[in-house]
Amino acid sequence: MGCVQCKDKEAAKLTEERDGSLNQSSGYRYGTDPTPQHYPSFGVTSIPNYNNFHAAGGQGLTVFGGVNSSSHTGTLRTRGGTGVTLFVALYDYEARTEDDLSFHKGEKFQILNSSEGDWWEARSLTTGETGYIPSNYVAPVDSIQAEEWYFGKLGRKDAERQLLSFGNPRGTFLIRESETTKGAYSLSIRDWDDMKGDHVKHYKIRKLDNGGYYITTRAQFETLQQLVQHYSERAAGLCCRLVVPCHKGMPRLTDLSVKTKDVWEIPRESLQLIKRLGNGQFGEVWMGTWNGNTKVAIKTLKPGTMSPESFLEEAQIMKKLKHDKLVQLYAVVSEEPIYIVTEYMSKGSLLDFLKDGEGRALKLPNLVDMAAQVAAGMAYIERMNYIHRDLRSANILVGNGLICKIADFGLARLIEDNEYTARQGAKFPIKWTAPEAALYGRFTIKSDVWSFGILLTELVTKGRVPYPGMNNREVLEQVERGYRMPCPQDCPISLHELMIHCWKKDPEERPTFEYLQGFLEDYFTATEPQYQPGENL
């Protein structure tokens, strides 16, 4: 069954490896969305450096998940000397505009122009029609990217999150790029036993010099497809045989259409407000549609909340921030009342989710995982030299599968309301704000770290207001004198120690979000090997 070499010798144990440790937390990264996608590259110099440190430059992601320092050129590789690579649809897609093509999973395309990055001009071989298609909905025919089980540049933690989703049986699996070894892959499998219950095991797939693949040298394969076929028929030393590929969620689009990619000021008439989701100090949030067919979230701001000119300038930066733990900005209406159009998150704010929703029943592992997701998004903001300024559970949105995304980043500094700009006014979130920011207006990524520590208390207390029994003035005075919130009930000491670390008086002594992400992702697994040795491999 595709096995190139099988040697009759004692099974070799796979080397236990780790991608890193808590002291090397840079190895801990969330990958892109399950289907690799191309984001046009942009230099971080286009985003003002609000912090006093230098971050690494941004890189473009190639369309199949690799890293490239420049954006996609539009040149397609050839196959068989034909000069044309055919692509196949991985999902159904319904056209949003007259420029798009609707298509069904399995439909094949000839790509006519791929210079638009996220949107390619294509001709359907089924209908003969031409139009734009989202590039992360297709893959080359017969490539591993077209396989149901291939998830590309997906991080270890996100792989576990997807495999452990409700409804996946033991033996659900996926293959992803290795985070540590270039050219290698990782096989991740959902397993179960009496001691651990449901959990995920990871096996490294190594590449031979001649192009083959193996988990153990006893069984080598010419292709990943042959490897999957082999282990689908027998466990052969794995924790169990491969039963079914993990379900891929629909890939995220970073723009509403090919036209709004560059021209994302849209007419108010193209938006329909359908259901009010929330009402805040500065406006409302609605579930709505764009063009009558695309579900979006629409934040409407009260006139006078911020200058339209300042907002548009900030939105130029916000639009460039693209990460799967940040709520994606799609478009704006910049004339008052200002409308901000973003991706829709079905479960609403984390605060409401914890207090009144499904979040009331969540246990510590789920809560720590949600904190890790927020830290991952903030680590990206940290790398891009940006600042949130208003990080709290009310500004985190929740989607299906307990996915968390950061919203409203950067907007706080634009608010012109006197009750807010006074910083000690009634509308200012004193209880979440670092003392140097509340007293002197010194907002940096380190003041965001302080706020993250407060957000951790919201998670473990299921949405309790910080500093219970104290008003804003008392909080400012007590914190300046060195007071810090005690360990909440049922909160592990180690997690409270992390909060205290976030609340160091000297901002430079607070941890980075990169460290916080690694610590929280590994909170329950720090003593386990990164890769499984296998039993009889």
From Swiss-Prot:
> What phenotype is described for loss of this gene?
Mice have various neural defects, including defective long term potentiation, impaired spatial memory, hypomyelination, abnormal dendrite orientation and uncoordinated hippocampal structure.
**InterPro entries per UniProt:** Fyn/Yrk_SH2 (IPR047924), Fyn/Yrk_SH3 (IPR035750), Kinase-like_dom_sf (IPR011009), Non-receptor_tyrosine_kinases (IPR050198), Prot_kinase_dom (IPR000719), Protein_kinase_ATP_BS (IPR017441), Ser-Thr/Tyr_kinase_cat_dom (IPR001245), SH2 (IPR000980)
Q: Which residues cross the membrane?
A: none
Localization recorded for this chain is: Cytoplasm; Nucleus; Cell membrane; Perikaryon
Q: Which residues form the SH2 domain?
A: 149-246
Residue positions annotated to bind ATP are L277, G278, N279, G280, Q281, F282, G283, E284, V285, K299
Positions of post-translational Phosphotyrosine modification: Y185, Y420, Y531
* Keywords (A to Z) from UniProt: Adaptive immunity, ATP-binding, Cell membrane, Cytoplasm, Developmental protein, Immunity, Kinase, Lipoprotein, Manganese, Membrane, Metal-binding, Myristate, Nucleotide-binding, Nucleus, Palmitate, Phosphoprotein, Proto-oncogene, SH2 domain, SH3 domain, Transferase, Tyrosine-protein kinase
Which of the residues bear the PTM Phosphoserine? S21, S26
Q: Cite the record's tissue specificity text.
A: Isoform 1 is highly expressed in the brain, isoform 2 is expressed in cells of hemopoietic lineages, especially T-lymphocytes.
Q: How is it modified after translation?
A: Autophosphorylated at Tyr-420. Phosphorylation on the C-terminal tail at Tyr-531 by CSK maintains the enzyme in an inactive state. PTPRC/CD45 dephosphorylates Tyr-531 leading to activation. Ultraviolet B (UVB) strongly increase phosphorylation at Thr-15 and kinase activity, and promotes translocation from the cytoplasm to the nucleus. Dephosphorylation at Tyr-420 by PTPN2 negatively regulates T-cell receptor signaling. Phosphorylated at tyrosine residues, which can be enhanced by NTN1.
Q: List residues with covalent lipid attachment of type S-palmitoyl cysteine.
A: C3, C6
Q: Which cofactor does it need?
A: Mn(2+)
Disulfide linkage? none
Q: Where along the chain is the active site annotated? A: D390 (proton acceptor)
- One MF term in the entry's GO annotations: CD4 receptor binding
Keyword Metal-binding among record annotations: yes
Domain annotation SH3: ranges:
82-143
Subunit structure and binding partners:
Interacts (via its SH3 domain) with PIK3R1 and PRMT8. Interacts with FYB1, PAG1, and SH2D1A. Interacts with CD79A (tyrosine-phosphorylated form); the interaction increases FYN activity. Interacts with TOM1L1 (phosphorylated form). Interacts with SH2D1A and SLAMF1. Interacts with and phosphorylates ITCH, down-regulating its activity. Interacts with FASLG. Interacts with RUNX3. Interacts with KIT. Interacts with EPHA8; possible downstream effector of EPHA8 in regulation of cell adhesion. Interacts with PTK2/FAK1; this interaction leads to PTK2/FAK1 phosphorylation and activation.
What is the name listed in the Swiss-Prot or TrEMBL entry for this protein?
A: Tyrosine-protein kinase Fyn
Species this protein is from: Mus musculus (Mouse)
| Gene transcribed to yield this protein | Fyn
